[in-house]
A protein has these predicted regions:
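ATP-dependent NMP and nucleoside kinases share a basic, alpha-helical "lid"
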Residues: 410-451
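Auxiliary tRNA-acceptor-end handling modules of aminoacyl-tRNA synthetases
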Residues: 37, 60, 64-87, 99, ...
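Ubiquitin-like/PB1-type beta-grasp interaction modules and other compact soluble beta-rich domains
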Residues: 1-93, 98, 104-115, 126, ...
């Protein structure tokens, strides 16, 4: 059987792993930036521990079909590839949770949110986990990496997996598997520890060559991943207290509502309590906008600039905020940054020949600054409107002038960009906010759902 690994031909040896073939070709490297972490075969991700040439009855059908479909063509995945980073992350999870289990056998560790290129993991134990525990945990992780433990996946029945997870104190994973219809489940083990992270991992723990572990200042740690620009060095942890506080508050509410994992959500649905969960969340959402409206009035702001990624709910949030401001006797006026797009035929295409409509240069920032400055000074402006069918901006004839109770709400992708603000504007007149759809719900304590 011939294989083409990254375009180089090699003959598969019966019983030999992909990793061995990679090494025979001289494609393995000590530097993380060049080191293969996994392989892509016919669009699927495979571990480098996979054996292409083996007895047919031992070869899982999906893997065999992928090899046949690819014609033996294999692409290696490195850290620069998004799938390669996912493989690295799963390997990190296994090693970190194994280290926590070994140091604190009765502890409950939970994977939470990411801050930049770092991952937050909290540890619930008695006595409470503190920053003073971080050096010992870091040392244990380093030991597990140094041991270069092979990470081999094995298949067991779903019932066996449920029993093993429950016996090991991982009740959340056992509960999630109770909803699984497939009679088997794939796991990774080391000693009496068993886990799974819904995808392939690196061949061994020694592949975690670039990392750091720092305290989050409370009952957890921030795992620092390789720098995305240079994977051969660890990223710098930058504290974002407001960002972290929002995630922590969301997770606290999930806990209070008894809905921290997918198994919790399934139970609520089964108990007929889903509508109650939705109502409570809607009330919480309204309370958040009410508190924001109070902050706007306390600051005596006259313009709210609301930003967020595509489909994050910017328009919905702007309307909800407007309602709360009306309740407080104000007259909110909604303006969309989309109406300040430049005419499409005046926008230069990017290097790929396509228009990047998410770039700030597609917005007529000069006109927006003029209008915002004039409105804040009590002057009247004529509002534009962008016609997405024609790709051109038109004059609507609609004018706007703010009275004493008026507050502008501007929503758009670039709402936080300082280039939108007039140079002479007083800072207290501008209130900026960012909205995004957070999902603090985990599959289980060790597997988050990224957003």
């Amino acid at each position: 059987m011939n294989l083409w690994i990254d375009g180089r031909q090699v003959e598969a040896v019966p019983g030999e792993r992909l990793l061995d073939a990679v090494r025979r070709l001289g494609l393995d490297h000590p530097e993380l930036s060049r080191r293969p972490l996994a392989a892509r075969i016919a669009g699927e991700t495979f571990t480098l521990n996979y054996v292409p040439q083996r007895e047919e009855q031992e070869d899982p059908a999906a893997m065999r079909r992928a090899m046949e479909a690819s014609g033996g063509r294999i692409t290696l995945l490195r850290y620069a590839d998004s799938r390669g980073r996912q493989v690295y992350t799963r390997t990190v999870q296994f090693v970190l949770f194994l280290a926590i289990r070994q140091l604190y056998p009765g502890a409950v560790a939970k994977m939470n949110f990411t801050v930049g290129q770092t991952l937050n993991v909290t540890v619930e134990k008695e006595p409470a986990f503190t920053p003073g525990d971080v050096p010992a945990l870091k040392e244990r992780v380093a030991q597990l990496v140094e041991m270069d433990i092979p990470l081999l996946r094995k298949r067991i029945t779903t019932q066996e997996a449920m029993a093993a997870f429950a016996a090991g104190g991982q009740v959340d994973q056992a509960r999630l598997l109770s909803w699984r219809k497939t009679p088997y489940f794939d796991v990774y083990t080391y000693g009496d520890y068993m886990d799974y992270f819904y995808g392939e991992m690196a061949p061994s723990t020694g592949y975690l060559s670039v990392w750091d572990l720092v305290s989050d200042g409370g009952t957890g740690v921030q795992f620092c991943f390789p720098d995305s620009g240079n994977p051969d060095r660890v990223c710098q942890y930058r504290e974002l207290p407001n960002f972290s506080a929002v995630f922590a508050e969301s997770e606290r509410w999930c806990h209070l509502m008894g809905c921290s994992t997918v198994a919790d959500l399934n139970d609520l649905v089964q108990q007929g309590r889903l509508s109650e969960l939705i109502r409570v969340n809607e009330a919480l959402h309204e309370r958040s906008f009410s508190q924001i409206a109070d902050q706007i009035l306390q600051r005596e702001a006259k313009a709210v600039l609301l930003a967020g990624p595509s489909s994050s709910g910017k328009t919905t949030s702007a309307n909800r905020l407007a309602v709360q401001l009306r309740v407080r006797g104000k007259q909110p006026v909604l303006i969309s940054l989309d109406d300040y797009y430049r005419d499409r035929d005046t926008i230069a295409p990017g290097p790929d020949g396509k228009l990047d409509l998410e770039h700030i240069n597609t917005i007529d920032t000069d006109l927006f600054r003029q209008h915002l400055s004039a409105l804040l000074q009590g002057q009247r402006v004529q509002l534009p409107r962008f016609d997405f069918l024609t790709g051109r901006r038109t004059d609507t004839g609609k004018t706007l002038e703010l009275d004493g109770d008026a507050i502008i709400i501007v929503e758009g992708l670039h709402g936080l960009n300082p280039v939108l603000l007039p140079k002479d504007v007083e800072k207290h007149l501008i209130f900026r906010m960012y909205v995004s759809a957070l999902l603090p719900l985990n599959l289980d304590n060790h597997n988050r759902i990224p957003t």
